[in-house]
Amino acid sequence: MNEFAIILMKKDKENVIIEEVSTLDLGLDAEYINSIFIKDKDDKEYISIQLSTKSGVEDWEYSAIYDYYEEDKILEYLKSKGKTDAVVSICEEEFNPTWEYTFIFSEEIEALELFVNELVQVHKNELQDVFLEIKDKEGEYL
């Protein structure tokens, strides 16, 4: 089993990378992460993590996934973990369905690594439910 490591970077207000913060050791599910970084806003550090499908989807699936994916489930998970400030946005400019979750960064790196693994698992489970739900709906989207 191959493990993935993701370098957590910090960006400035102009979106320029200014610092390498840490390396997060993640399992195979890291394939669901498009990007993750820290950014300062209002004198606080925020984590932004973009989660997507781990592989390409067909055109009809793109729309169906957005229709059936429940961002609120992920937000509920984040809030249950103390991320009451968490927000989600859809990244329409991405090739595959992608959601960006943003919340205040307040953990030690080891705790963040565990948290990101759990978050990706919740996202992966939601996508699996979505794919089961849409598997016979191609005709509705063509």
Predicted regions and their residues:
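Short, extreme N-terminal segment that most often corresponds to the first beta-strand
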Residues: 1-21
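Glycine-rich loops and low-complexity Gly/Arg-rich segments
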Residues: 32-33, 74-78, 126-130
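Ordered hydrophobic segments in well-structured contexts
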Residues: 5-8, 48-52, 89, 98-104
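A generic structural signal for short, non-catalytic loop/turn and secondary-structure boundary residues
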Residues: 1, 44, 94-96
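Short, internal acidic amphipathic alpha-helical interface segments
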Residues: 58-98
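Ampiphathic alpha-helical segments that act as solvent-exposed interaction surfaces
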Residues: 81-86, 90-142
